[in-house]
């Protein structure tokens, strides 16, 4: 069997960023024919062809992703820059507030009291001059000192000239500050007299006079100014000011004009500088009033110690530290650990909820229950994949994986346990030998599959029973005249055996599709072809019954060509041959084509390693135990080997071929029956020979537990919505069934068929199914759950029949699947409540009315059609309108009461509780008849 590395087409399309039609069109132009479906598997060679052509599309997709990532990075960087700017602005605001807090110190210092000593203050001022230039915001502290120094007129003009040359606007800033400082100083020191104020005005006049002289002089005067010079000239200026009052008036006039200019400018400066700057904010506060300005600053601004303490506490909170001691720290750590653990558990639970742990062949309804979605969503997902499924149809592993991916779920199968625990041994190419091909015979029911195998076995003159088993897969080994061996698998053709056909296609190397020449390409034939194509095995068509007069092989080939399956006769690649399984015509040539196909496949296997293969069937043989029919695919199986098969394990005690002959060992491509398993494995399970018995038991136990968990998850509990639906329906019933069969494949087929019979009014529940005879425990379970026991090719064992009679449990046994399905369908129809259908029995015309006291109105009538019955209901019709509906209280002919009156006779009748009867009215008699309901599928 060829199991090449393949890739799904939809993954390749997403990788190269191309459409399905584009890929299929390009591959067709290159000579590669593939199905135009997203789920089609493509080989590595086709992948390379697509990669060479569409690598540019892939690179464009990658480039677009990179561009998108770069844009994301740019947005993130821009966001960080904005965040940093915002933080920087906040820090500047904090610095501004802190600087305003520091300015309060110089404002409250009482240096104005030192005006009595102008000489000492001038020396201090000269030493502090460099610092004042660095900090312009401290100018209010300089101004009172300058006002007191009346004996230094030449020094200050020199300094102001320098400022005027460098920054002309600084002078305008400094002058308003002199006036603003006065109200602040007056409020800070209440003991001040009015005399210093007059001196300050005089000092301002002298400074203004100095400024007028500066304007006339050049910048050269700044170079000649010395610190020692102003000490001598300051005294003379004071004397001249006192002697010349005329000059004061002129200077005052100039000061008034300049004060007006300053006020105008100050208003403008306030409007501009309110936005920022410590000095401007300070000036605005002085304008409003020092009292209102100082209070919020003292309240808002903490001390340096408080700031540092707050910073330390914040850092400790961020670092998870605490100054409360080790106990609080330990409790906080425990809370954090518990919170983190809870978050991890929640994340793990969410991820686990997205993983479906299932076995293969789960029904659509079970998958919907596990994923908590509507069944219709699963069906629509399958339809998008080109599959028509029903809610009770089973999905194989491949389809289940694809459907789960559509709903963002992952699927884990039980076979993964073996793959994890059992290491695959690398095979030595020298040990590989040619093995016999495994051929599966598939087709529609009654098209001659088993008849073909019967003839093949009879042709080889091999003693034994004919393999006429049609209810499950039969495995046979055939040796031809030339010494070649072929292993045949016979699959059933009934629609209920979908899963068994799928397993047969997965195990096989070559598929023979049998089609009757006098019939058509039936649905099961199409299904078998699709299974073979999905498994990737070559197909050979055997057109059977070609010896019949009604046979038309060309019609079959035409239908196959319409399905895009061209046989060699019509120029295609698929082999076909006309045969007759009854006469044997063409069978030999068909086998030769099978051997030719096997040679092309170059089938090889290693007989020296531990055996592995597939379980074909399993059943319980009374007296011997569980027997499994298996097909060895690699290695050699021997008596005494410990085998793990699905959820069961055991040591092989005996091996037999299909005719009951004992076999010591079985090589590759050999079907045998083994005895020794502890249970009946499911058909399709893989088996492996294990070296360690304990390891095999552990894996089997894990699989059993997983299957039990899956059964619990897929068991639907009744909900309020379902209860409401049943109440609204009014007549809802359930049919519980316990199903026992001879082989696992037949049990599964019956389970699917029975569940498909469920309708809105009757729900079929398979509460238990198994392989083997009907036991007492089955009867007791049926008694407890009010169920019916159905046996397929099995009978009650021991006292089961007596217990069933005592408990009044119905046991039905069948040997043909059609009979079981039809009987169950009839039973379900019998459970349905009959429908009431109205039937009109006759009509009568009122010719005359008679009114009798104490009785009422009597109608004299003539029956015009049908029969009027005494027990029937009646309608009184007047002018084509129903006036009253009721029943008769009496029906008489002449004076005698009668049960019925037929057409053409007259009679008298009285309508119960109604007397408004007139001549010409029509009385219509009717009665309700119960009609049997039929099943309506969902």
Swiss-Prot record:
PROSITE patterns: G_TR_2 (PS51722), IF2 (PS01176). Residues 206-215 have a biased composition (Acidic residues). Residues 443-450 are annotated as: G1. Residues 57-205, 248-259, 297-319, 334-344 have a biased composition (Basic and acidic residues). Residues 580-582 are annotated as: G5. CDD domains: IF2_eIF5B, IF2_mtIF2_II, mtIF2_IVc. Residues 260-270, 285-296, 323-333 have a biased composition (Basic residues). Residues 468-472 are annotated as: G2. GO terms for cellular component: cytoplasm. It is found in: Cytoplasm. Residues 434-602 form the tr-type G domain. Belongs to the TRAFAC class translation factor GTPase superfamily. Classic translation factor GTPase family. IF-2 subfamily. This is Translation initiation factor IF-2. It comes from Christiangramia forsetii (strain DSM 17595 / CGMCC 1.15422 / KT0803) (Gramella forsetii).
């Amino acid at each position: 069997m060829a199991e090449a590395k393949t890739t799904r087409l939809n993954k390749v399309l997403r990788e190269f960023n191309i459409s399905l039609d584009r890929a299929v069109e390009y591959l067709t132009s290159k000579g590669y024919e593939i199905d135009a479906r997203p789920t089609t598997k493509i080989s590595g060679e086709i992948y390379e062809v697509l990669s060479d052509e569409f690598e540019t599309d892939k690179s464009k997709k990658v480039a677009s992703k990179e561009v998108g990532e770069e844009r994301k990075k740019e947005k993130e960087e821009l966001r960080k820059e904005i965040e940093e700017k915002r933080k920087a602005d906040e820090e500047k605001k904090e610095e501004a507030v802190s600087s305003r807090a520091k300015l309060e110190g110089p404002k409250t210092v009482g240096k104005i009291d030192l005006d009595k000593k102008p000489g000492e203050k001038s020396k201090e001022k000269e030493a502090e001059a460099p610092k004042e230039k660095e900090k312009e915001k401290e100018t209010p502290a300089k101004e009172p000192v300058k006002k007191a120094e009346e004996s230094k007129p030449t020094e200050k003009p020199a300094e102001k000239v320098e400022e005027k040359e460098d920054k002309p606007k600084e002078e305008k800033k400094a002058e308003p500050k002199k006036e603003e400082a006065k109200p602040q100083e007056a409020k800070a020191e209440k003991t001040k007299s009015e005399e210093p104020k007059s001196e300050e005005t005089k000092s301002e006049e002298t400074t203004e006079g100095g400024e007028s002289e500066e304007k006339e002089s050049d910048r050269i005067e700044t170079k000649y100014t010395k610190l020692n010079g102003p000490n001598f000239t300051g005294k003379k200026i004071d004397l001249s000011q006192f002697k010349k009052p005329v000059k004061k008036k002129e200077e005052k006039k100039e000061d008034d004009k300049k004060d007006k200019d300053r006020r105008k400018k100050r208003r403008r400066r306030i409007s501009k500088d309110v936005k920022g700057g410590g000095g401007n904010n300070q000036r605005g506060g002085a304008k409003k009033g020092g009292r209102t300005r100082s209070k919020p600053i003292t309240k808002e601004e903490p001390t340096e110690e408080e700031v540092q303490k707050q910073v330390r506490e914040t850092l400790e909170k961020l670092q998870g530290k605490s100054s409360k001691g080790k106990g609080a720290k330990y409790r906080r750590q425990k809370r954090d650990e518990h919170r983190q653990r809870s978050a991890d558990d929640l994340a793990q639970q969410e991820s686990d909820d997205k993983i479906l742990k299932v076995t293969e062949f789960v029904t659509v309804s079970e998958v919907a229950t596990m994923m908590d979605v509507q069944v219709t969503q699963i069906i629509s997902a399958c339809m998008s994949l080109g599959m028509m499924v029903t809610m009770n149809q089973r999905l194989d592993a491949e389809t289940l994986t694809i459907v789960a991916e559509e709903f963002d779920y992952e699927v884990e199968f039980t076979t993964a346990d073996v793959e994890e625990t059992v290491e695959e041994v690398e095979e030595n190419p020298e040990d590989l030998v040619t093995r016999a091909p495994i051929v599966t015979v598939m087709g529609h029911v009654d098209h001659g599959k088993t008849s073909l195998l019967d003839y093949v076995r009879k042709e080889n003159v091999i003693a034994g029973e004919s393999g006429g088993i049609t209810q499950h897969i039969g495995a046979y080994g055939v040796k031809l005249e030339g010494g070649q061996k072929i292993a045949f698998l016979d699959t059933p053709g009934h629609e209920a055996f979908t899963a068994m056909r799928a397993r047969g296609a997965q195990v096989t190397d070559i598929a023979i599709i049998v089609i009757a020449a006098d019939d058509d390409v039936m649905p099961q034939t199409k299904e078998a072809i699709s299974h073979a194509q999905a498994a990737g095995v070559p197909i050979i068509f055997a057109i059977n019954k070609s010896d019949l007069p009604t046979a038309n092989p060309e019609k079959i080939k035409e239908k196959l060509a319409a399905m895009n399956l061209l046989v060699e006769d019509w120029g295609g690649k698929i082999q076909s041959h006309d045969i007759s399984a009854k006469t044997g015509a063409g069978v030999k040539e068909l086998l030769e084509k099978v051997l030719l196909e096997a040679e092309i496949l170059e089938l090889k296997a290693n007989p020296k390693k531990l055996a592995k293969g597939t379980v074909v069937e399993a059943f319980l043989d009374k007296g011997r135990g569980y027997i499994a029919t298996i097909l060895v695919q690699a290695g050699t199986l021997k008596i005494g080997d410990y085998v793990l098969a699905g959820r069961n394990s055991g040591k092989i005690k005996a091996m037999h071929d299909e005719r009951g002959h004992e076999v010591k060992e079985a090589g590759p491509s050999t079907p045998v029956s083994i005895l020794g398993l502890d249970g009946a494995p499911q058909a399709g399970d893989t088996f492996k020979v294990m070296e360690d018995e304990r390891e095999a038991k552990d894996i089997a136990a894990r699989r059993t537990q997983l299957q039990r968990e899956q059964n619990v998850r897929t068991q639907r509990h009744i909900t309020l919505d379902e209860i409401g639906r049943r109440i609204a329906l009014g007549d809802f019933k359930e049919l519980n069934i316990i199903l026992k069969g001879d082989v696992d494949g037949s049990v599964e087929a019956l389970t699917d068929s029975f569940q498909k019979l469920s309708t809105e009014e009757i729900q079929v529940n398979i509460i238990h199914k198994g392989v083997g005879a009907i036991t007492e425990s089955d009867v007791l379970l049926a008694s407890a759950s009010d169920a019916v026991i159905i046996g397929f090719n099995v009978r009650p064992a021991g006292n089961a029949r007596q217990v069933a009679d005592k408990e009044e449990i119905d046991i039905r046994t069948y040997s043909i699947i059609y009979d079981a399905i039809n009987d169950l369908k009839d039973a379900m129809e019998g459970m349905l409540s009959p429908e009431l259908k109205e039937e009109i029995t006759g009509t009568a015309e009122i010719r005359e009315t008679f009114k009798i006291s104490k009785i009422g109105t009597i109608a004299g009538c003539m029956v015009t059609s049908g029969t009027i019955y005494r027990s029937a209901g009646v309608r009184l019709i007047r002018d084509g309108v129903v006036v009253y509906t009721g029943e008769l209280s009496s029906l008489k002919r002449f004076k005698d009461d009668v049960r019925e009156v037929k057409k053409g006779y007259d009679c008298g009748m009285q309508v119960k509780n109604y007397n408004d009867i007139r001549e010409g009215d029509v009385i219509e008699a009717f009665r309700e008849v119960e009609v049997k309901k039929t099943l309506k599928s969902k």
